């Protein structure tokens, strides 16, 4: 039983630290980064930093329309948020 619990915790912790993968699509199908950021700004986001991650995400750091500090991983093809982290 202890071994099963230990394995469960080990597997769970390794997936918790896995990097966020947003897409496997060819880069030619991705949205234009500048146009994508402009769309976010139109929705009320303030972008302090924007980057493309090693795991094929558009990652934004800044503030949402409610003024909360956020870090968001976006699928660069669809623009949908894959992961959102709020920071105090």
Show which residues each predicted segment covers.
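Short, low-complexity, Pro/Ser/Thr/Gly-rich segments in the mature regions of secreted, periplasmic
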Residues: 77-88
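Short, non-transmembrane alpha-helical segments in secretory-pathway proteins
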Residues: 23-47
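N-terminal signal peptide c-region/cleavage motif recognized by signal peptidases
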Residues: 13-16
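Conserved histidines in hydrophobic membrane contexts and catalytic metal-binding motifs
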Residues: 58-61, 71, 79
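Glycine-centered tight beta-turn/hairpin loop motif at sheet-sheet or coil-to-beta transitions
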Residues: 65-67
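Surface-exposed patches in mature extracellular/periplasmic domains of secreted proteins
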Residues: 48-53
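Positively charged n-region of N-terminal signal peptides that target proteins for export
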Residues: 1-4
């Amino acid at each position: 039983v202890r071994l099963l619990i230990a394995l469960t915790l080990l597997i769970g912790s390794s997936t918790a630290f896995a990097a966020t993968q947003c897409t496997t699509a060819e880069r030619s199908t991705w949205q234009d980064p500048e146009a994508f950021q402009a769309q976010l700004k139109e929705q009320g986001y303030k972008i302090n930093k924007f980057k493309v991650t090693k795991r094929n995400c558009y990652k934004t750091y800044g503030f949402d329309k409610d003024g909360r500090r956020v870090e968001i991983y976006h699928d660069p093809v669809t623009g949908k948020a894959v992961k959102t982290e709020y920071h105090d």
